[in-house]
Amino acid sequence: MRKLLIILLCSPIIVFGQNLAVGDTYEGGIIFYLDGNGGGLIAAPTDQATVNDFPDWGCIGTAISGADGLTLGTGAQNTIDIENGCTTSGTAADICSNLVLDGFSDWFLPSIGELEIMYLNIGTGSNIGNFVNTKYWSSTEKDETYAWSWEFSSGYQDYNSKTSNKYVRAIRAFSNITNINKQQISIEKKIIKIFDVFGRESNNKNQPLFYFYDDGSVEKKIIIE
């Protein structure tokens, strides 16, 4: 079974005399990850594609070589590989790749691991990133038919047809991302149902929920806000 490696690091760091922390506005967006060595990831302050103009992943039927990076630090290369392997304009990756915001033009579509960290650090609680409770595309391809997305309403990954239309939030990196401590979560399985302790279907936060997957496994999670 494939695994997704992630990290949560919220400690302030010093960059060129500045004391930076997750949630700060910096270089065109909102910091959602710091590596402790002067590097980090920034989310654009608003969605690049919304309900009135939201794209598909693109190029269904084609497996994009190299666009399967799962972890922190892989979204940029995923986006490059998608742009090279899928010439369709207006796709999720294409929108991010062509974004120019506050003078920065190095934006990209986040990997599924980067999306999860973005959700956990600036998407829950006070929702600093002002995300919508819906699915956002990642740059992580599953195969020629499906790509991974992150559900911001309940906090889990899913894979969807590349023809599906979803929200998009671009990100960019500052300095070189290093010192990535990792933990494992499952990626190669799909949620079928979510139940509360009384057996009712629920996506409510701040309570124990049971996630039932298509491989027969069950996980108990609590998403705190």
Regions found by a protein language model. Give the residues of each.
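Short aromatic-cysteine micro-motif
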Residues: D35-F108, I112-G113, I117-N121
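Short, compositionally biased serine/threonine- and acidic-rich segments at solvent-exposed termini, linkers
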Residues: T178-N179, N206, V218-K221
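Residue-level detector of functionally pivotal "anchor" positions at catalytic/ligand-binding pockets or at interdomain
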Residues: S175-R200
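C-terminal, surface-exposed recognition/capping segments
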Residues: D24, G28, D35, S89-T91, ...
